[in-house]
Amino acid sequence: MNEPRGSEVWIGGLLCEPVNPQACAGVVFFNNVGVLNMCGHGTIGLAVTLAHLGRIQPGEHILETPVGDVRIRLHDANRVTVINVPSYRYRAAVPVDVPGYGQFVGDIAWGGNWFYLVEDHDEQLELANSERLTEVSWAIRMALEEQGITG
């Protein structure tokens, strides 16, 4: 999970016995930053892993996460549908002043974790610009924390 080969995008899942007797498993997701309440791609990978281990068969299942039950449908060994916990916009048009970049306006949303979603910016969304996008994203994240803007 940690450098030199790991990064924040690597996700681990700690399998636990579920409290809900209808759940096939409990899971706590984490990365090199800390615990994640929910992870969509981690859920897909976990469903495929549970099938590989023989713990689930194709069909609908419940996966217990710290934020609630997530429904998964295993179609076959490599295809999964995830029905996440309910998502919502908590606050709209929230400004944040980011040193060196100016002001951004975004929505705070919940989808298993908290997100700050920015639509209007001057950055090019392309792979060649990934380093700059990462810098700007981290600057926004730090400014949100410093200014106490949270979900």
Map each language-model feature to its residues.
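A glycine-rich beta-to-alpha transition motif near the start of alpha/beta enzyme domains, typified by
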Residues: M1-D107, E119-G151
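Glycine-rich ThDP/TPP pyrophosphate-binding loop and its adjacent helix/strand module
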Residues: G112
